[in-house]
């Protein structure tokens, strides 16, 4: 009993002194406690929920070394910088280091100088690393971005399977912990199974980010839509994601031409330019960045007020993770997806023309392809549903709030008219029957609209009994009905690029009138009431102090060559503005300020606060 009390005190002490927090966030303490008890853990926690503390804190209390497997070099470097700034000795092993640097880092770890070692999965089976782990005292192996180990995941990497062999090779099995931000039930089960987690403690903290507003728009001109949005949010920092480098360059040039302080990021730029552009964004020199999805992993910029998607992403997992880079400070932020049917075609092309991965077997390649197509289908449904957008995504991840109206998405803030479209749905079903389930949405839509196209005539659909039965209806309306039928399970699509429409067991219930298909149709949109987004609880003077502290943070970050959030987070700056600390003890009561952070930076921030208050007195 005394040992448990002592561990609890030590745990709280590390949380306070190293990480600067008085209390754990949702799910963190349970995960930490189970790891310290020697139990395997699987944590599913959304972006910004504090996953890293869940393994970094127990790593400092366990007797040996913790190995953290991470897929991205930039992510490792930032994590190690943040730990070093907090007074924790950590290292990383990846291709950014020379062989001599790797040898030195592993030697130092073996000598007990590092408690945490980050490693790229490709390094796990190198002779040097194997020699190290077989002779070192390994207390825990942590797998970050654990969805990469699952064939059901959106980013399956065969190199992650090397982790399984590594665990088996160790003379003593360590605690194994796995973390990811986005995982469906199938992916979660696969993570547990493939890693061979022993009776794991599984914690899903919930995917909902209530401060994020979600919206899907289908503009006639995406460029004009983006420009108007950015111009009306000039004071805000934002990310604009595009599916291709070509679109990144086009949108970037358009915004720059119109006087926006904007930068860009994609794999076609050289390393130096990517690094410089990323720093311009992080330091708010250029608060807007246009990027492919190569950008953002591990970027902890808390004041991003909006994420626009110029193109629809390939899957809900990617969309939720990318959109989740907005509002990490807990303040209101907007996530807006600009959809066009062309986005589906672009993504199908990208899926069909993925570069060959020699690590994949033929069976794995087919499984990944089929899963990609299935996920793309779910993403497309998101863009057409009239139901709550937040609830749609939560349901996708296996979470159900039971709410019909979240009050913070475009569908829930819209006024809809309900229409019974059972008759149209019945015509669709009869047409699919008549063609013996051989065609997809475009052909079925063209058939019942009676379109006079040579391609349709070549299929012989002009002889169908249903040809032209919905001639008066628009193409978009019929496609909307078909999407609704797919969503409600009255139809299904094949999992390939042709997306052939197939009937289900419930299809005939619409023809018989046993069930009805009710579709929401947008009548008019209410203007979304945008809140003035300023740090919580700050008055005009508090905002002036916040800006002074923010500028001080940027200067320090540049001098130290670290991202600003590593110095202090926006939340910490806001807390300083509220509490106005004057002494070390008072500064240590600020959320996010630990002993090591205080010793490095605290005095400069205390001085800045004092100068601000003295100016207040003079002008008072």
Regions inferred by a protein language model and the residue ranges of each:
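Accessory DNA-binding and partner-docking regions appended to nucleic-acid-acting proteins
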Residues: 2-11, 345-346, 357-362, 371-373, ...
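Flexible coil/turn residues that form the inter-helical turn or adjacent wing/linker of helix-turn-helix
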Residues: 172, 234, 386, 437, ...
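Short, charged low-complexity linear segments at domain edges
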Residues: 367-397
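Short helix-to-turn junction characteristic of helix-turn-helix DNA-binding domains
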Residues: 35, 230, 281, 383, ...
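Helicase motor core with emphasis on the C-terminal RecA-like subdomain
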Residues: 5-18, 22-26, 30-52, 60-62, ...
């Amino acid at each position: 009993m005394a040992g448990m009390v002592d561990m609890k005190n030590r745990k709280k002490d590390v949380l306070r002194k190293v990480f600067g927090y008085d209390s754990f966030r949702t799910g963190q303490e349970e995960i930490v406690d189970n790891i310290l008890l020697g139990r395997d853990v699987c944590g599913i926690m959304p972006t910004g929920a504090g996953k890293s503390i869940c393994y970094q804190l127990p790593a400092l209390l366990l007797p040996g070394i913790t190995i953290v497997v991470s897929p991205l070099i930039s992510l490792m470097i930032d994590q190690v910088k943040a730990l070093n700034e907090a007074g924790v000795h950590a290292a990383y092993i990846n291709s950014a280091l020379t062989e001599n640097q790797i040898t030195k880092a592993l030697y130092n770890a073996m000598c007990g100088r590092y408690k945490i070692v980050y490693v790229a999965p490709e390094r796990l089976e190198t002779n040097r690393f194997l020699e190290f782990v077989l002779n070192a005292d390994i207390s825990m192996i942590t797998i970050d971005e654990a969805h990469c180990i699952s064939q059901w995941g959106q980013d399956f990497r065969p190199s992650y399977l090397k982790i399984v062999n590594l665990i088996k090779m160790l003379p003593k099995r360590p605690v194994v912990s796995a973390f990811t931000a986005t995982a469906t039930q199938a992916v979660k089960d696969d993570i547990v199974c493939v890693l061979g987690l022993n009776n794991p403690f599984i914690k899903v903290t919930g995917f909902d980010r209530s401060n994020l507003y979600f919206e899907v728009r289908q503009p006639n001109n995406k460029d004009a839509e983006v420009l108007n949005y950015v111009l009306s949010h000039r004071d805000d920092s934002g990310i604009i994601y595009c599916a291709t480098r070509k679109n990144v360059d086009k949108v970037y040039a358009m915004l720059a031409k119109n006087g926006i302080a904007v930068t860009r990021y994609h794999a076609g730029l050289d390393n130096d330019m990517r690094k410089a552009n990323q720093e311009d964004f992080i330091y708010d020199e250029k608060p807007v960045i246009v990027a492919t999805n190569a950008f953002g992993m591990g970027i902890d910029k808390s004041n991003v007020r909006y994420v626009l998607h110029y193109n629809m992403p390939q899957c809900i997992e990617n969309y939720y993770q990318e959109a989740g880079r907005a509002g990490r400070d807990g303040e209101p932020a907007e996530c807006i997806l600009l959809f066009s049917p062309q986005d589906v075609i672009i993504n199908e092309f990208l899926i069909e023309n993925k570069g060959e991965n020699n690590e994949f077997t033929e069976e794995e390649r087919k499984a990944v392809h089929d899963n990609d197509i299935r996920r793309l289908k779910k993403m497309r449904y998101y863009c057409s549903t009239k139901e709550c957008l937040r609830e749609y995504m939560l349901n996708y991840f296996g979470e159900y709030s039971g709410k019909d109206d979240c009050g913070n998405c475009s569908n829930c803030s819209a006024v809809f008219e309900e229409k019974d479209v059972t008759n149209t749905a019945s015509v669709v079903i009869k047409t699919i029957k008549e063609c013996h389930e051989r065609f997809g949405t475009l052909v079925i839509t063209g058939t019942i609209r009676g379109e006079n196209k040579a391609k349709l005539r070549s299929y012989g659909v002009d002889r169908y009994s249903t040809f032209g039965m919905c001639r008066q209806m628009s193409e978009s309306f019929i496609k909307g009905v078909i999407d609704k039928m797919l969503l409600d399970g009255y139809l299904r699509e094949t999992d390939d690029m042709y997306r052939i429409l197939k009937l289900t067991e419930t299809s005939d219930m619409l023809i018989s009138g046993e069930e009805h298909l009710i579709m929401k149709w947008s009548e008019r949109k209410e203007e979304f009431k945008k809140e003035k987004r300023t740090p919580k609880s700050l008055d005009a003077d508090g905002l002036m102090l916040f800006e002074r502290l923010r500028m001080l943070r940027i200067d320090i970050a540049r001098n130290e060559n670290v991202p600003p959030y590593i110095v202090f987070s926006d939340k910490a700056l806001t807390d300083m503005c509220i509490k106005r600390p004057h002494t070390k003890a008072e500064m240590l009561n600020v959320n996010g300020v630990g002993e090591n952070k205080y010793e490095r930076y605290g005095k400069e921030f205390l001085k800045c606060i004092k100068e601000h208050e003295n100016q207040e007195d003079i002008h008072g």
